[in-house]
A protein has these predicted regions:
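Active-site microenvironment of metallo-dependent hydrolases
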Residues: 16-20, 27-153
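Phosphate/diphosphate-binding loops
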Residues: 1-22
């Protein structure tokens, strides 16, 4: 309901309090949609189009940091991941556009992931899924097709 949605993730209050705000997906119950998470945090607009408690929006920069360096800090791994710096693991994604040059309300619809790097090495999606033990790759085939259509991997 609307009242529950309005109280959902009071991110602005958390940032104002000095908390290390992080965003993530729980793979077992939600799809891995970091760009949509960032978009929602910056706009408070849900998939249905409703805007819940707009005063709890955070800036695009705060939302991006919440999904990168702050998430790594929450896990105690910010010395290894969460940002690109000498001595870190070089785990990152390449995006089709600069998120700071796109309307935050259109982030997930405008920007796509062009590739993923782990330890500085570009990952081939098919190889990764096979190595991860995907029993039936059919549910993931659209990812590979999208990757090839966008000259990825």
């Amino acid at each position: 309901d609307h009242d529950h949605g309005a109280r959902w993730q009071p991110l602005s209050d958390a940032v104002a309090s000095g908390a290390c705000v992080s965003l993530h997906n729980d793979g077992s119950v939600s799809p891995p949609t970091p760009l949509l998470n960032v978009q929602t945090a910056a706009t408070r607009r849900t998939r249905s189009g409703a805007v819940h408690d707009p005063e709890q929006r955070i800036t695009l920069d705060q939302a991006l940091r919440a999904h990168t360096i702050n998430a790594a800090r929450t896990l105690g791994r910010d010395h290894l991941v969460g940002s690109i710096a000498v001595g870190k693991l070089a785990d990152f994604v390449g995006l089709s556009d600069d998120p700071y040059c796109v309307d935050p309300g259109e982030l997930a619809q405008t920007i796509s992931v062009l590739g993923t790097w782990l330890g500085g090495q570009r990952i081939n999606l098919g190889t990764f899924l096979a190595a991860a033990g995907a029993q039936d790759p059919a549910p993931h085939q659209h990812l590979n097709e999208t990757a090839h259509a966008r000259h990825c991997c």
